[in-house]
Structure formats: C-alpha cells, structure tokens
Design a protein with these regions (language model features):
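A composition-driven surface/loop motif
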Residues: 1-180
C-alpha cells in the first residue's frame, strides 16, 4: 500500500496541501489496518487527498479480502477510487465496508468495477454508513451500489441526516442500498 495504518489505537491524518497515494495490486491507496478508528481531517481547510487503490483494493480502506471499517472523514477534499472489485471508500475485494462516517469536507468516492462507491467491495456488504455533513458524491461500479453493498451484497443501516449527497449505482446496482 502507498500508506498503511497499523497498531491497536486510533489514527488521525491531518491533510495539509495536496496529497496523492497510488497503490499496486491487492492494496488500498490508504490502507486501514489499525484496530481503532481512522480519521481524515483538515483543520486548516487547505488540504486534499487523492487515494487510488490497485486491483482488488479500495481507494481508502481494505486491501484484497480486507474490510474497510471505522473510517471517519471530517474535512478536506478527499477523492478515493478503488481498483476493480474494491470500493472507493470501504472494503477491498470480498471485504465489507462498515462504520464509515462523513461529517464534513468534499468527498468523491468511485469504484473501478464491482465495488460500491462507499461501502463494500465486490462480494462485500456495506453496513452502518452515516453522512451528516459535507458534499458527498459516490458512484458504484458495475452491479454495485453508490452507497452500500458491492456486487451481490447488501447495504444496511445507511443514514443521511445532513450535507449534500449524490449516490449513483453502477449498472443494476442501487444508488443507496444493495448491489445486484
């Protein structure tokens, strides 16, 4: 992975200036491997992150067969693109995307193919996804939801209580909900 978080605690990433991460096969651009929460923030309001996963990896979240969970975005301009089978933000191939929260910032999340924009990778569920602020654009890959489940999987407990949200599923996938 271009950057991988590890350990038992929480990880906070403060965005300053322009940042780009691109990973190779089976890895997320920003790969979350720590047990605690991963928070992406931009207190100075001048930061951006462009994270691109390789084949089977999420843009931000899990690598191949890895879950993308406990991810919070509070600010910044964040663009996340998963590789084929990976979510933009959430699970890698076969990985669930759960406990994902957006409270602010400008977030664009796209899957290469078969993963959700925000939620599960291909064959991964998207659970407990909450958006309460910011501007969020989420586009799922073929057969996957914009926000929710990847290909052949479900989207559950998705809450939108604020912000501006655009969610488009790929071919045969829901905008918000499950994949084909």
């Amino acid at each position: 992975a271009a950057v991988s978080t590890t350990g038992e605690g929480n990880v906070n990433i403060e965005l300053n200036g322009s940042n780009a991460l691109k990973s190779g096969h089976s890895h997320a651009g920003l790969e979350k491997n720590n047990d605690g929460n991963l928070t992406i923030q931009d207190k100075d309001k001048d930061g951006s992150l462009n994270a691109k996963g390789g084949q089977d990896g999420a843009g931000i979240g899990g690598g191949s067969s890895g879950a993308g969970s406990d991810i919070t975005i509070t600010g910044g301009k964040v663009t996340a693109r998963g590789g084929n089978y990976g979510a933009g933000i959430g699970g890698g191939a076969y990985g669930n995307g759960s406990d994902i929260t957006v409270t602010g910032g400008e977030v664009t999340a796209n899957s290469g193919n078969y993963g959700a924009g925000i939620g599960g990778g291909g064959w991964g569920n998207g659970n407990n996804i909450s958006i309460s602020g910011g501007k969020v654009t989420a586009t799922g890959g073929t057969f996957a939801a914009g926000i929710g489940g990847g290909m052949h999987r479900d989207g559950n407990d998705i809450t939108i209580s604020g912000g501006e949200v655009s969610a488009d599923g790929g071919r045969c996938g829901a905008g918000i909900g499950g994949g084909l």
